[in-house]
Swiss-Prot record:
Family from the record: Belongs to the ARTD/PARP family.
The gene coding this protein: PARP3
Main location as per UniProt: nucleus
Domain PADR1 zinc-binding: 38-186
Name of this chain's protein: Protein ADP-ribosyltransferase PARP3
One cellular-component annotation, GO: nucleolus
Amino acid sequence: MKVHETRSHAHMSGDEQKGNLRKHKAEGKLPESEQSQKKAKPENDDGRSVNGAGDAASEYNEFCKAVEENLSIDQIKEVLEINGQDCSAPEETLLAQCQDLLFYGALAKCPLCGGTLICDNEKRFVCGGEISEWCSCVFSTKDPPRKEEPVKIPDSVMNSAISDLIKKHQDPKSRPKRELGSADKPFVGMMISLMGRLTRTHQYWKKKIERNGGKVSNTVQGVTCLVVSPAERERGGTSKMVEAMEQGLPVVSEAWLIDSVEKHEAQPLEAYDVVSDLSVEGKGIPWDKQDPSEEAIESFSAELKMYGKRGVYMDTKLQERGGKIFEKDGLLYNCAFSICDLGKGRNEYCIMQLVTVPDSNLNMYFKRGKVGDDPNAEERLEEWEDEEAAIKEFARLFEEIAGNEFEPWEREKKIQKKPHKFFPIDMDDGIEVRSGALGLRQLGIASAHCKLDSFVANFIKVLCGQEIYNYALMELGLDPPDLPMGMLTDIHLKRCEEVLLEFVEKVKTTKETGQKAEAMWADFSSRWFSLMHSTRPMRLHDVNELADHAASAFETVRDINTASRLIGDMRGDTLDDPLSDRYKKLGCKISVVDKESEDYKMVVKYLETTYEPVKVSDVEYGVSVQNVFAVESDAIPSLDDIKKLPNKVLLWCGSRSSNLLRHIYKGFLPAVCSLPVPGYMFGRAIVCSDAAAEAARYGFTAVDRPEGFLVLAVASLGEEVTEFTSPPEDTKTLEDKKIGVKGLGRKKTEESEHFMWRDDIKVPCGRLVPSEHKDSPLEYNEYAVYDPKQTSIRFLVEVKYEEKGTEIVDVEPE
């Protein structure tokens, strides 16, 4: 066996690295600087020490000094063991644990998982156990539960010089209560201003900031700092940002808010500055330490390194020598793994491949590292002369990484998640769209040789280009360059769906609150982002985040997987008209609607009448129609078929551009789950609206990508329509009976302006006016049907979003 390349010989966790740094310390007595509690005693507002009430703090410091000077490390371990405490921590931590135990009493087990509690940097007690096999425990408190029983003292300590001092604190009734330094409210006294499209809504951050002692201002006058999305600087910023810079106010990223809340204290503003240094590229900063928008820029520009199950990992360079994934007895020796443990802050991936190269031995490639921290990843490429030995080593590594056997997984997908072990990402045999679709340069050549109508060719060019899929995955944080999230097996997608549905039901029925509820959400988030490998996983907290970052993300990944399979590999010779070829595979007829026709005028009128500007921060975006396409698809009921059904309405459907190909190719799919939020409120339904404004919010992606598409579809609501002004408690009945549903919003279209199209299809086109349902969770009316055969896509409306109050000038490239 020959080792060709090794970038890092050992991949160690943070705990392991700390352990190595401590190896030089002498056993037994520890350095005073690391043994003793800090002597500085911060004070509360009333002047009391936060480490204890009154003299208790001083007494505790003297007690700690006595324990440190008189007990050996062996005696310390004996005290901890006899009182049922964990002794696996580093020695300096064991001393602090022992001092706390002897003075304040033995810690009880974690109320969430039964694990062991330890004091974390004198700020709060945290748990070292696991909630489940997916997630480490997230329990933390300043007032830990303690055993209401006398401390057990081993004989060796009873015979020590400080036995009388220790006995004094044995009785639970005589113990003072330990109070730790307060860091609960990091924003006390701060006025913070928000700007731009952050990963969480401004309303979310307003509540979070106020809950943590701060206030939010709509202006920058007198504020502590301005929190922005770094995307704002790329577009030149707004007057608000310019004003802040002119006043010398700190302009920081959203990560400052996130880290300050998580660490319970305000972080240094200068470390999160986004205007004095506009580029992090080349700094080698791990993505989890960057602002989400900065990470997105790097991940978006990174090339996909493995396109699917047969993809040789790009960094091996073996594909340049004709390398192919080794296959034997029906097994492909190419595995990808992910682990996301939000309790420990882990987000890592692993790649294992056996690669055959012409006129060479078998090659084994192994890579493991933190997401976005490529320079520090463990990576090796080894050449094996013995094929059987290489196969055995591959299987051994698989079991080491995943805690399961390779062959049962590869043949039958049998696997059981093990604590602290990776979980396989089940790649499919195909080419992910980020690799197989056409790049910008190739698109120009392909379009020039396309035999389709020029407008249709440009539309197909959008669907077959990498850009819309790259951006969609990037916005969701599901675009890791190492793993092909757009080429997953149906089994893996089904597993994701089952995990999501199981958790949705748990959310609906749970009575948990406080830290137990937080643990439940952390466990799901870790599980979800292990299956849906992300560049920026987050701990989800509520149903709105569940809808945005799980349900909607799943639907997008599912649809992109469909696009990957249809588009395939277009990287070859573009002179063979690949756009026409993919158009034929779609099984549909798409034609541009004449701008002088009645249909075109009807569509434009419907859009303009029911549209309201999309608002991002303090900027509003209007919309203009570029083209209207008529659609006839083999997968969708024809207009003649749909006209045979009752109660037909022409409605708007919002969609990302990345989801369009699937809609045309396969038809609409119902929502993946039922949640009490718009879009999911009526369960597993196909949801539309009579307001173009509602659809436009789904179609709008970002200010620097103003193009989008809205869908107009005919929906048959059936003979019976049920109206709701609040989320229905039971959506299962609606799904089973396939009853048409109308959700009444706070705004409605003026009914006197409605008209009919194609004889008996209602077009609810009218000015948006306030409705009598002022407390509805819906802003606009929503309509839901449960059978895809009740919907028929009629038009795709190509639109352009434009900032209101500005003049748009097209500039030719130099």
